[in-house]
Amino acid sequence: MSEMAELSELYEESSDLQMDVMPGEGDLPQMEVGSGSRELSLRPSRSGAQQLEEEGPMEEEEAQPMAAPEGKRSLANGPNAGEQPGQVAGADFESEDEGEEFDDWEDDYDYPEEEQLSGAGYRVSAALEEADKMFLRTREPALDGGFQMHYEKTPFDQLAFIEELFSLMVVNRLTEELGCDEIIDRE
């Protein structure tokens, strides 16, 4: 019974921890990225235990510069005086009218499939291609031979065959009697 009590306590603690993490609780301060200082404060949770809460930027963020060096423009600084808000321009960017298109890298990229195989790799590839051709040439006759060897095991609907045969014989006689074959030959 004590195991059940321990499990229920663990379940309650885990659900409390999950509820503390869920967004929209309102107990966490709303902060912008990179603002504030890094301070540790103790905050009581619903279960009564105190938890550590970190505020402010992380150490990696402090080590990196927050602003772009002077002379270079970043997206956070906004557009220059001559630019419209939705337009991004710089020394590195060229419009499609002024220079090459962006997808020209595909022309310069060497695809491994296009490289010539040399040595043992080429011989193995050629042998596999030859075996594939041989298989394709022998597959159909082998299937036909297998059918002929085991024809007694294959299903054959004699009634359907006889009906089809008689219908073709009747159609052929009717076309001869009516002279339809002469009309078909003229066209």
Curated annotation (Swiss-Prot):
Keyword Chaperone part of the UniProt annotation: no
Record annotation: effect of changing E182Q: Abolishes RB1 binding
Keywords: Cell cycle, Cytoplasm, Differentiation, Nucleus, Repressor, Transcription, Transcription regulation, Ubl conjugation
Gene Ontology terms for molecular function: histone acetyltransferase binding; transcription corepressor activity
BP GO annotations: cell differentiation; negative regulation of DNA-templated transcription; negative regulation of transcription by RNA polymerase II
InterPro entries (UniProt xref): EID
Localization (cell): Nucleus; Cytoplasm
Tissue expression: Widely expressed. Most abundantly expressed in heart, skeletal muscle, pancreas, brain and testis. Expressed at much lower levels in placenta and peripheral blood leukocyte. Barely detectable in lung.
Location of the motif LXCXE motif: 178-182
GO cellular component: cytoplasmic ribonucleoprotein granule; nucleoplasm
Region listing for Interaction with NR0B2, in residue ranges: 54-120
Sequence segments annotated as region (Disordered): 1-118
Additional note from the record: Inhibition of MYOD1 may be partly due to the ability of EID1 to bind and inhibit EP300 histone acetyltransferase activity.
Name of the protein: EP300-interacting inhibitor of differentiation 1
Organism: Homo sapiens (Human)
